[in-house]
Amino acid sequence: MKFLVLWRMELSLLSSEMAAAVARMPRYAGPLERAGKVIARYHLVGQHGGAWIYEVSSNEELERTLAMSPVYNFARYEIHPLAEMPDPVNP
C-alpha cells in the first residue's frame, strides 16, 4: 500500500525541542528508505514541512511508522492513499 503523507510544522509550537526534532529527520528517514518503506521524500517549497511517499503493508504499519517520526508531536499530517493509474488505452 502506498500513501502520500503531507506534513507541515505547527509554527505555534516553535521551540528548541522542535528544531532538534527537525534535525533528527534524516536519521529517521535513512533506515526507512533503505528498507523500502519511504520511496520518495520532498520538501514543500515555501512551507515548513514535507511530502513523503510511504510503501507499507497496512494502515497500522503506516500509523506506527509515522508515530516514530521525530516531528510527530509538532506537525499536522494529511494522508492520501495512492493507487496505480493504469493506461486506459493499453491495459
Regions found by a protein language model. Name each.
Residues M1-P91:
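Conserved, structured core segments of small domains
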